[in-house]
Amino acid sequence: MVMYARKQARLSDGCHDRRDSQPYQTLKYSSKSHPSSSDHRHDKMRDSTDPSPPNKMRRSNSPENKYIDSAGHGKAKSMHLHRVRERDGGTSFSPQENSHNHSAIHSSNSHSSTPSKTSDSAYDPADDWSEHISSSGKKYYYNCRTEVSQWEKPKEWLEREQRQKETSKVAVNSFPKDRDYRREAMQAAAAVEEKHSSDTSTMLPQNILSQTSRHNDRDYRLPRTDSHSSAAPVQQPVKAAVHPAAAPSTVPSSPFTVQPDHPPPKKSYDANGAALSKLPTPTSSIPVPKSERKETASSDKSSCTTPSTSSAPGLNLSAAPPSSSSSTVPVSPVPQSPIPPILQDPNLLRQLLPALQATLQLNNSNVDISKINEAAVTQASLQSILHKILTAGPSAFNITSLISQVAQLSAQAAQSNQSPMSLTSDASSPRSYVSPRISTPQTNTVPHKPLLSTPPVTSQPKVGTPGSKQGSSAQTASQQSSAADKSQGHEPTSPRNLQRSSSQRSPSPGPNHNSSTCASSTSAPQNSSARSSCSLTPTLAAYFNENLVKHVQGWPADHAEKQASRLREEAHNMGSIHMSEVCTELKNLRSLVRVCEIQATLREQRILFLRQQIKELEKLKNQNSFMV
């Protein structure tokens, strides 16, 4: 009789013995060949919760059953649904069907010139193929309709990839073909010129509204250029840049020059073509810059450099169509004088600010005005934003991004010892208020430079703003202030002398009115619906450090986010590989332990067997000795 040693229970090391899925097996073998999410129904890879290894797949996990279970209907049924939907003329609405019909929707939605083939056909034959991994680890492709398997990639997929490449190539820089943008722009320019020659003082609100609405459906895209690539309009407006390097004292007689290589009459007709490289004409741009150009002109009469925004280099002011305010300033550019350093004059920057704010409100843009007010804190930030407005065309007029940059720049108030503006808006009243809170004239700011040769601007421009009352009242206020400024003969007033009176200022420019001239030109016509907010107060500005938040603003934040996601992916992959290595090592060690256990059991059994034999031999010895 042989006694067996009782086998001890093995130590559990936290890993289950059987069905132990390793992470590298559960990593998705996602198909790189077709991006549509329809291949999830054919996905033979089990997700990480399914414990069975991929080569021992149960029948219920096969792609067809999986899809029928999850979607609740078979493939034929869903294909039938797609056909019905497409016959009705609509694309599918439920997200599941959307994902299966991805290619059809893609081709119909992108504004491509290629006709949408996939939306007309009943289904895409490429959807029948799915990609799988064989037990040997190689990829193979399976057609669920014909039940054919093959090693090489099916030709339907290759055709679909080719189609998608073409559509994406065309969709990058394409417009609907049914609109002739160049002809529209030329007609608009011609109409505006006729209108101006006949009636220079006022402009009918209907014309303005139709003009604005004509631009509103342009999708806020760049105007098409026939001779330049899509990147050209972005880089080339820099040629029309104002040179801030010149000294502020050398303000020349004329605000802007006609660039000799573009004759003015040619310019307006060339608007969407090659001349766009110099500066985009207002007719082809989005509404925001147009009104920007105009209102700036109306709000800073005092220093006649301001047709900077309204008269483009190479365009007389009379050729620029006013969109939201129809004041016309007869400024004639002198041909060969150099471009003035507009952006060096802080007074001018202060005066350009209200125009920007009024423009944003007139266009009903929901931009937070307080961010611009923060930007007004420093001269450098104002310079940068206005430099962008003056030099860049519609490409730079993604207003929200512009203002986020302004908010960043406003943080430089901590370094400058100038007291920042605190602009408060009374949300209940539509009029613009000016309140005397900070009336400390600073000595370190550049005083108002008298511009000696001012072009004759005698008539007060009429304001016909159809959009909103606030804008027009604020503009008349700023015009009165600039008129008073002119009558006083450009006395040097500090731009930081921001006097505000919490009651409405008297419309008659009296003798004491000059103290609040600069204030009114800088006061922002706040929209009544804009929520009341104020910029950094001087005490807070002392504690504000731009460097601490610079990394979470604007493009550095996007860059950091991309880096973080890339690092996260890498860490995940590395972790998976490391985990799989550790798992295999652990299994190896566990098998060694198992071998040792088996050897120990064998030894124990051998010892027991030998003891048994010893006992039997002793018995036999005793019997022998007894018999002897």
Swiss-Prot record:
<feature type="domain" description="WW">
    <location>
        <begin position="123"/>
        <end position="156"/>
    </location>
</feature>
<dbReference type="GO" id="GO:0045893">
    <property type="term" value="P:positive regulation of DNA-templated transcription"/>
</dbReference>
<feature type="compositionally biased region" description="Basic and acidic residues">
    <location>
        <begin position="176"/>
        <end position="185"/>
    </location>
</feature>
<feature type="compositionally biased region" description="Polar residues">
    <location>
        <begin position="199"/>
        <end position="213"/>
    </location>
</feature>
<comment type="function">
    <text>Acts as a linker between gene transcription and histone H2B monoubiquitination at 'Lys-120' (H2BK120ub1). Positive regulator of amino acid starvation-induced autophagy. Positively regulates MTOR activity. May negatively regulate the ubiquitin proteasome pathway.</text>
</comment>
<keyword id="KW-0804">Transcription</keyword>
<dbReference type="InterPro" id="IPR036020">
    <property type="entry name" value="WW_dom_sf"/>
</dbReference>
<dbReference type="InterPro" id="IPR038867">
    <property type="entry name" value="WAC"/>
</dbReference>
<keyword id="KW-0156">Chromatin regulator</keyword>
<feature type="compositionally biased region" description="Basic and acidic residues">
    <location>
        <begin position="37"/>
        <end position="49"/>
    </location>
</feature>
<keyword id="KW-0805">Transcription regulation</keyword>
<feature type="compositionally biased region" description="Basic residues">
    <location>
        <begin position="74"/>
        <end position="84"/>
    </location>
</feature>
<dbReference type="InterPro" id="IPR001202">
    <property type="entry name" value="WW_dom"/>
</dbReference>
<feature type="compositionally biased region" description="Basic and acidic residues">
    <location>
        <begin position="152"/>
        <end position="168"/>
    </location>
</feature>
<feature type="region of interest" description="Disordered">
    <location>
        <begin position="1"/>
        <end position="130"/>
    </location>
</feature>
<feature type="compositionally biased region" description="Low complexity">
    <location>
        <begin position="101"/>
        <end position="121"/>
    </location>
</feature>
<keyword id="KW-0539">Nucleus</keyword>
<feature type="compositionally biased region" description="Low complexity">
    <location>
        <begin position="299"/>
        <end position="331"/>
    </location>
</feature>
<keyword id="KW-0175">Coiled coil</keyword>
<dbReference type="GO" id="GO:0006974">
    <property type="term" value="P:DNA damage response"/>
</dbReference>
<feature type="region of interest" description="Disordered">
    <location>
        <begin position="417"/>
        <end position="532"/>
    </location>
</feature>
<feature type="compositionally biased region" description="Low complexity">
    <location>
        <begin position="467"/>
        <end position="486"/>
    </location>
</feature>
<feature type="compositionally biased region" description="Polar residues">
    <location>
        <begin position="511"/>
        <end position="532"/>
    </location>
</feature>
<dbReference type="GO" id="GO:0006338">
    <property type="term" value="P:chromatin remodeling"/>
</dbReference>
<dbReference type="GO" id="GO:0005634">
    <property type="term" value="C:nucleus"/>
</dbReference>
<dbReference type="GO" id="GO:0003682">
    <property type="term" value="F:chromatin binding"/>
</dbReference>
<dbReference type="GO" id="GO:0000993">
    <property type="term" value="F:RNA polymerase II complex binding"/>
</dbReference>
<dbReference type="GO" id="GO:0031571">
    <property type="term" value="P:mitotic G1 DNA damage checkpoint signaling"/>
</dbReference>
<protein>
    <recommendedName>
        <fullName>WW domain-containing adapter protein with coiled-coil</fullName>
    </recommendedName>
</protein>
<feature type="region of interest" description="Disordered">
    <location>
        <begin position="152"/>
        <end position="338"/>
    </location>
</feature>
<feature type="compositionally biased region" description="Basic and acidic residues">
    <location>
        <begin position="214"/>
        <end position="227"/>
    </location>
</feature>
<dbReference type="Pfam" id="PF00397">
    <property type="entry name" value="WW"/>
</dbReference>
<feature type="compositionally biased region" description="Low complexity">
    <location>
        <begin position="230"/>
        <end position="260"/>
    </location>
</feature>
<feature type="compositionally biased region" description="Polar residues">
    <location>
        <begin position="420"/>
        <end position="446"/>
    </location>
</feature>
<feature type="coiled-coil region">
    <location>
        <begin position="599"/>
        <end position="625"/>
    </location>
</feature>
